[in-house]
Amino acid sequence: MKIIIGGKTFDAVLEDNAAAKKLAEKLPLEISMTELNGNEKYFRFNERFPSNDSRFATIHAGDLLLWSSNTVVLFYKTFSSGYSYTRLGKILNPAGLPAAAGNGNILVRFEK
């Protein structure tokens, strides 16, 4: 999968689970993601995804996770966390991701 942010393309892999398969069915997909906490961008769908949440002690830059069964979150910084998510996938090489993500809301394109 490719994740395109501001003209920069990142290679990513999806997990082998029901939530990631549902996301893959929506590709190609272009969404406006909202900035949160200086470390993530999120988009809330109007539908629920299958979820199998587990607690993440550390979130890594490039993690693509599902929160609360309907919110896709792309993390662009690594930090400690106590929240639970379902893993959707990850960017293979997140170098340059913080710069591409910037400080505000962004348009993100997901492609096969």
Walk through the language-model features, giving the residues of each.
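N-terminal non-globular leader segments, chiefly Sec-dependent signal peptides
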Residues: K2-I5, E25-P28, N52, N105-K112
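N-terminal secretory signal peptides
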Residues: M1-Y42
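Well-ordered alpha/beta subsegment
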Residues: G89-K112
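Compact, glycine-rich, soluble single-domain proteins
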Residues: N37-T58
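Short, compositionally biased
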Residues: F75-I91
